[in-house]
Amino acid sequence: MNPDSAAGRSSRRAFLAAVGGVAAGGLTATAGCLGRGEEAPTVSILAAGSLQRALTTEFDAPDGTRIEVEAHGSARVARMVDDDQRDPDIVALADPALFDAPLSVPWYATFANNALVVAYNPQTEGGTRVTEAASWPDALLDDAVSLGRTDPDLDPLGYRTRFALALAADHYDRPALTADLLRRDQIYPETQLLAQFDAGGVDAAFVYRSMAVERDYPYLELPAAINLSDPDHASAYATVSYTLPDGVTVRGGPIRYAATRRTDTAAAKSVFEALVGTAGDFLEPSGFTVRASHPHYFGDVPPTA
């Protein structure tokens, strides 16, 4: 494969070797502890689906606190809060633009980045074709390869997939690429997409690098001009957009994760500070990027943040 068009193969082992870490397993929510007989205050976090595993298996809640994590697509999370369906202490999203609309929060902090990749299943015939194709667009256009993606109306991964394809159409001078690739029967909720992938029902899928690393999926790296990871390409990313069902238009940009705190309890403050302040410790082993400059605060930030 051409290194630019196929962008090379990677896996969890290769990524962890590069960052020098090993991610722990487990499925239970993280909890701090108090002395015997005392009950730790619980802090609720409503989060992007791509943060769920890291928050529940890697994040160390501060001593004296417990966390409860509920995760969905970020666009759905934003609507749930905006419609008063949920009232969490902390909201953590995969796109800070959603804090401006449909939400309207006074402040938030960005704390991590990610990249789009194409994960593939080497155990299926279609997945094998992905590794053998001349380029990743050619691989995904193969009728024998079943492609999965998430719903752009429900989460940023879905609309970022559309962004990446639009950017790829320009990058490779293949203007029909997006129209040729996208079909409604490819769309799954995020958890169902991963289940289909694990069961062999989908040969390849657009996912965040963190999702592939966490689950040990082999994947193709995409060029920086396409994968929405590089601030140097921000102006090019911003040329693509998608309009959500509520009329909000989101534009392409480097993938950023952001969080806001909605309550002022000591426990919520402590958990929030740990979440944005130690993101590198619990997110980098899972394939996220946490730059040394993080966290960045925006808006009318309270003195206690």
From Swiss-Prot:
Q: GO terms for biological process?
A: molybdate ion transport
One Pfam family name is SBP_bac_11
Q: Name one GO molecular function term.
A: molybdate ion binding
Which CDD domains does its entry note? Answer: PBP2_ModA_WtpA (cd13540)
Q: What kind of modification does the protein receive after translation?
A: Predicted to be exported by the Tat system. The position of the signal peptide cleavage has not been experimentally proven.
First and last residue of the signal peptide: 1-40
Key words of the record: Plasmid, Signal
**Family statement:** Belongs to the bacterial solute-binding protein 1 family. WtpA subfamily.
Describe its assembly: The complex is composed of two ATP-binding proteins, two transmembrane proteins (HVO_B0370) and a solute-binding protein (HVO_B0369).
Q: Describe the task this protein carries out.
A: Part of an ABC transporter complex involved in molybdenum import.
Output this protein's name. Answer: Putative ABC transporter molybdenum-binding protein HVO_B0369
What is the native source organism of this protein?
Haloferax volcanii (strain ATCC 29605 / DSM 3757 / JCM 8879 / NBRC 14742 / NCIMB 2012 / VKM B-1768 / DS2) (Halobacterium volcanii)
